[in-house]
Amino acid sequence: MLRASSFTFGIYKINPARSSITFTYIVEFKFGLRKTFTDKLVFPDVAPELWEKIPKDVLAPTLQALLLILGINYWCVFPTKNIRIAGFTLTREQAQFWDSLYLNGLGEFFYDMKMDFQDLISFPYHESKIAPEPARFVRPARALLLNGAGKDSILSAELLKKSGTPFDFFAFAPTPAHKKIGELVGAKTIRV
């Protein structure tokens, strides 16, 4: 197996017309070999004009975090200490958070693969980077509930109904079972 010399969390790009977001990752190997991976999230139930209503200071850090968490799938295939981030920088505290999340989130993977993970994960940061102020995005009081197509989804939905909290379901690649749960509960399911 080729050993990666660097792993770059590349860019993310929103396509409002298609209500999709692509995330790019680049793995570099010796002798200039490169492999690029792309993840794409599609939000078929989100109208194109809604993307402009999300404040940039809310959307940008959200997509940056998504870029980093989705990248775990590629980084664990090509683990390297040389982690790079294109397009934005992290604070020391943010880097420590991502170090911890990757280390603890991949614990079973490291064990199963018999990998030495000591000092393997080190997200880059800039000392001068100041943590941004939390962005305000006032939204109506409501909830977004994962529709896992099982009894827990029904129970959670009933608890939200009982509390008077309006909600919608969301599901990744929904199946007929997801649709049935949504109909049973009487809630809209947003497809992702």
Could you describe each region identified by the protein language model?
Residues 1-142, 154, 159-188, 192:
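RNA-binding accessory domains that recognize and position tRNA/RNA substrates
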